[in-house]
């Protein structure tokens, strides 16, 4: 049967329906006979059950052919990849690679003579995508040294081949792949030098070209997959590649409309910084604090647009959160007037305010944070952090605000103008800040008591897993913000008689023994670890005292017990 002649014959299918036939008064049998003589298409178009739009639009002969093809497909069993077929695929790939190389050498000045071989090579590489559905064959894939083959192909002169290999590796390292197979493939890729190769590959691409932009995206996507398997490779990325430098440089590029690659580069940089101290120090040395502050500077005046720009902004703030956890990062943040920018962001009350508060939390926390706390007060930060404290109810942001207030109590030197200004904020407007603080304390106290009661009813054998489970339950129900409220209320008790009197009144009105506050502080103290001093911290901030948490709380607890 000539299938082409059937589908290409338009003589009948192009006929128009005769309105006179539709209005015919002939018996139904005569009309059916007439329709059969003309074409099944007319019957399909005016099917009584569904109207012409529900018909198949096919003649009987065409429908017969399609039914036959459907039956043939139904009878065929879906092909499955076997070890033997995988070996054949590898052999075909090697032959295609060799053929392409020979033609490239032979016709180096005539690309049209070898372009077909590269199309064949592209198809052979893509054929390996199916391997992600057969993780049991990954060991054979590795034994056949396919990793080396594909990594060599990443250096191919044709960037399209490089991109096809990247797409294959993305597919094979997807999180949905069997964990055991993924881990073995991951180890082989890292041991074979994939990370330095990615560093060189990403520099090959010119993002002014659409295909190359896709290549950059593929490198970033593969990096994300690898980091999700094991983020310990961050140390290799820092020591053996220039990927951090590239990511920082790409993150600082100004774009009128934030591109996917810019957003992705900042996201990958944030992941690396969150998992590597070496990366944090490297970015600090590369003037990264200044570059990232410039990146978020526009948001002191406007909000980012939804989508890529907003996500990019959040990732930049995450980068800064990681950097200011290091002593060097804190110092550079102060030097580059990061605190002043944060205050402008809080003043704007836009989307950046919440992320700004998070950065300030990490900046002001720590044993060497006195200069940053002083600068925060000097720059006028108290007005805006307390305004946020009184209005913001989102649990995660409120947790950061409470931590900031606790850090200010910890680090602002006694009998200084900055500390006096800070204390006055709790007293002004009829103690409104203290009243709100107490309400938060009481709400969190009740939540955590509920967890303690549930734990007492858990009669399963004691184990580390059980302890972890209940500790996580406490965290979910506000353990950390509760600890901050305990510290703040305790400081207010020992600062002066006015604040102590007000706190006693608040506890009395709520029928809560103030001894509960002392007990909560004691419990917090017992769970603190002994302080450790890192080498770079010894050299930093020698003009200020080091204030470690446990010794500070020890003194606070003694003063608290004496006061109440």
UniProtKB/Swiss-Prot annotation:
Xref: InterPro entries: ARM-like (IPR011989), ARM-type_fold (IPR016024), CTNNBL1 (IPR039678), CTNNBL1_N (IPR013180)
Main location: nucleus
Domain of life: Eukaryota
SMART domains (alphabetical): DUF1716 (SM01156)
HEAT repeat feature ranges: 83-133, 138-177
A Pfam match: CTNNBL
Ranges occupied by ARM repeats: 179-229, 230-276, 277-326, 328-366, 367-411
Alphabetically ordered keywords of this record: Coiled coil, mRNA processing, mRNA splicing, Nucleus, Phosphoprotein, Repeat, Spliceosome
Residue spans of biased composition, Basic and acidic residues class: 9-20
Biased composition (Acidic residues): 37-48
Positions of the UniProt region annotated as Disordered: 1-56
Disulphide bridges: none
SUPFAM superfamilies: ARM repeat (SSF48371)
Gene Ontology cellular component terms for the protein in this record: nucleus; spliceosomal complex
Modification Phosphoserine, positions: 39
Subcellular location: Nucleus
Coiled coil: 465-528
GO biological process annotation, one example: mRNA cis splicing, via spliceosome
Reported function: Probable spliceosomal component involved in the activation of pre-mRNA splicing.
Record PANTHER family: BETA-CATENIN-LIKE PROTEIN 1 (PTHR14978:SF0), BETA-CATENIN-LIKE PROTEIN 1 NUCLEAR ASSOCIATED PROTEIN (PTHR14978)
Name assigned to this protein: Beta-catenin-like protein 1 homolog
Species: Schizosaccharomyces pombe (strain 972 / ATCC 24843)
């Amino acid at each position: 049967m000539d299938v082409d002649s059937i589908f290409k014959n338009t003589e009948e299918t192009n006929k128009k329906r005769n309105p006179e036939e539709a209005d015919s008064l002939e018996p139904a049998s005569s009309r059916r006979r007439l329709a059969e003589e003309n074409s099944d298409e007319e019957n399909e178009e005016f099917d009584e059950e569904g109207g012409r739009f529900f018909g198949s639009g096919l003649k009987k002969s065409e429908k017969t052919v399609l039914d036959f093809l459907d039956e043939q497909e139904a009878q065929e069993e879906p092909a499955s990849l076997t070890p033997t077929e995988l070996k054949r695929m590898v052999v075909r790939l090697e032959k295609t690679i060799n053929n392409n190389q020979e033609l490239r050498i032979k016709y180096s000045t005539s690309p049209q003579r070898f372009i077909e071989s590269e199309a064949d090579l592209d198809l052979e590489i893509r054929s390996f995508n199916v391997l992600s559905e057969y993780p049991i064959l990954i060991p054979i894939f590795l034994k056949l040294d396919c990793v080396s083959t594909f990594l060599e192909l990443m250096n191919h002169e044709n960037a399209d081949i490089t991109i096809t290999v990247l797409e294959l590796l993305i597919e094979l390292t997807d999180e949905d792949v069997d964990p055991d197979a993924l881990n073995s493939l991951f180890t082989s890729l890292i041991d074979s030098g994939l990370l330095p190769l990615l560093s060189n590959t990403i520099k090959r691409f010119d993002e002014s070209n659409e295909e190359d932009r896709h290549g950059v995206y593929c490198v970033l996507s593969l990096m994300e997959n690898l980091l999700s398997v094991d983020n310990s490779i961050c140390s290799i990325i820092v020591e053996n590649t220039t990927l951090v430098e590239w990511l920082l440089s790409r993150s600082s590029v100004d774009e009128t409309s934030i591109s996917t690659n810019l957003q992705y580069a900042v996201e990958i940089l944030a992941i690396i910084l969150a998992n590597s101290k070496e990366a944090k120090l490297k970015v600090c040395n590369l003037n990264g604090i200044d570059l990232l502050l410039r990146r978020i500077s526009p948001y002191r005046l406007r909000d980012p647009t939804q989508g890529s720009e907003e996500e990019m902004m959040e990732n930049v703030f995450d980068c800064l959160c990681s950097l200011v956890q290091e002593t060097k990062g804190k110092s550079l943040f102060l030097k580059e007037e990061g605190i002043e920018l944060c205050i402008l962001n809080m003043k704007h009350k836009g989307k950046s305010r919440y992320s700004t508060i998070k950065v300030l939390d990490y900046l002001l926390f720590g044993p060497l944070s006195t200069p940053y706390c002083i600068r925060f007060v000097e720059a006028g930060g108290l007005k805006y952090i307390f305004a946020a404290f009184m209005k913001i109810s989102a649990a995660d942001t409120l947790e950061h605000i409470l931590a900031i207030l606790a850090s200010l109590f910890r680090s602002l030197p006694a009998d200084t103008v900055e500390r006096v200004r800070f204390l006055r904020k709790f007293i002004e407007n009829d103690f409104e800040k203290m009243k709100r603080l107490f309400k938060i304390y009481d709400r969190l106290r009740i939540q955590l008591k509920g967890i303690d009661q549930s734990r007492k009813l858990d009669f399963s054998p004691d184990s580390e897993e059980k302890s972890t489970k209940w500790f996580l339950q406490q965290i979910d129900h506000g353990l950390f913000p509760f600890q901050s409220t305990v510290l703040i209320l305790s400081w207010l008790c020992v600062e002066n008689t006015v604040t102590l009197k007000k706190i006693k009144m608040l506890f009395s009105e709520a029928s809560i023994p103030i001894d509960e506050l002392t007990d909560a502080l004691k419990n917090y103290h017992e769970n603190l670890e002994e302080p450790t001093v890192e080498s770079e911290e010894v050299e930093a901030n020698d003009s200020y005292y080091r204030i470690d948490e446990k010794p500070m709380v020890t003194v606070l607890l003694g003063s608290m017990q004496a006061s109440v």
